[in-house]
Curated annotation (Swiss-Prot):
Single biological process term from Gene Ontology: photosynthesis
Protein name according to UniProt: C-phycocyanin beta subunit
Reported modifications of this chain: Contains two covalently linked bilin chromophores.
InterPro entries linked to this entry: Globin-like_sf, Phycobilisome_asu/bsu, Phycobilisome_asu/bsu_sf, Phycocyanin_b
Keyword Electron transport attributed: yes
Membrane topology classification: Peripheral membrane protein
Origin superkingdom: Bacteria
Record: residues binding (2R,3E)-phycocyanobilin 2: C153
Gene Ontology, cellular component aspect: phycobilisome; plasma membrane-derived thylakoid membrane
CDD domains linked: PC_PEC_beta (cd14768)
Length: 172
């Protein structure tokens, strides 16, 4: 796992060069935007159980076959596993937001997840829908202007959306 800083340094080191002005400017901007990033992660983390529960509730309302006998979320044990997986994905998305890089999400959460779901007979498309629902809720919470560092957060919200989209694509 590399954060944005370690990744840029590793790339420059591999080339045997100093950081370019563009790389330095990008890292400087990341530092300037750090409070917004921390605010977003704090808000998502503080509301994680609500985000997961509401996304699951909406998913099961749209796809009730998942919670009916024979469905992948039928029985308390399977439902708990579903909620746990959603929470884990959300947690790793927050790690990626904090790091400003998707490698922690990819390396520790998404790699091999589609194959695991296929082996278990879990419909990846349903998991992808749940992730999209978590994305919508997380962005709404993180982008609420009340009590957050002032300034334009559109680039950060786009970045956050990208992490959720990456997770959804990995399981679909």
């Amino acid at each position: 796992m590399l954060d944005a800083f370690a990744k840029v340094v590793a790339q420059a080191d591999a080339r045997g060069e100093f950081l370019t002005n563009a790389q330095f400017d990008a890292l400087s901007n990341l530092v300037k935007e750090g409070n917004k990033r921390l605010d977003a992660v704090n808000r998502i983390t503080s509301n994680a159980s609500t985000i997961v529960a509401n996304a699951a509730r909406a998913l099961f309302a749209e796809q009730p076959q998942l919670i009916q006998p024979g469905g992948n979320a039928y029985t308390n044990r399977r439902m708990a596993a579903c909620l746990r997986d959603m929470e884990i994905i959300l947690r790793y998305v927050t790690y990626a937001i904090l790091a400003g890089d998707s490698s922690v999400l990819d390396d520790r959460c998404l790699n091999g997840l589609r194959e695991t779901y296929q082996a278990l007979g879990t419909p990846g498309s349903s998991v992808a829908v749940a992730i999209q629902k978590m994305k919508d809720a997380a962005i709404a919470i993180a982008n609420d202007p009340n009590g957050i560092t002032p300034g334009d957060c559109s680039a950060l919200m786009s970045e956050i959306a990208g992490y959720f989209d990456r997770a959804a694509a990995a399981v679909a």
